[in-house]
Amino acid sequence: MLSSFEGEAVRPTSDRAREALFNILAMQTRGARVLDLFCGSGALGLEAYSRGASEVVFNDLSKDSLSILKKNLNALKITTGGEVKVCNYDYVACLDIQRGGFDLILIDPPYRLDCGATALEKIVKKGLLAEDGIVVYEWDKPLELEIEGLERYDERRYGKAYFTFYKATTV
């Protein structure tokens, strides 16, 4: 069982929602390069890794989040380095330093942080998605953003969480 946060200031993705999400993403996860942009406890990125992702980059600005992530990595006997990287940046700085080719980018910011447009535009501008890559944005309401270079192609609701799915548009 993974360590997680206590209290209501932080809202981890429910087990049910996480399982449903990765059942949808089953074909895209095996062998994938994954960026878990607001990783929190790391539950989403760890799920991707457990389902065969070849590389996972975890990022969070919160030192408390990274402390819990590191406990979870240790509990699962996952070492950081080659396949698993841990970053401590704000989301814009993290996106700025990444190289392209992510098959899956998971964006699960605190609900109070309205960063959807900025994050998605930066992903397009930097060319961070692989050709068939997917961005999944989790928020407390549908994310109805139209971003040039991305196609919003699906949305699912699980309890209080909405997952909005984007893929790169072809020219």
Predicted regions and their residues:
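Class I S-adenosyl-L-methionine-dependent methyltransferase catalytic core
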Residues: M1-V171
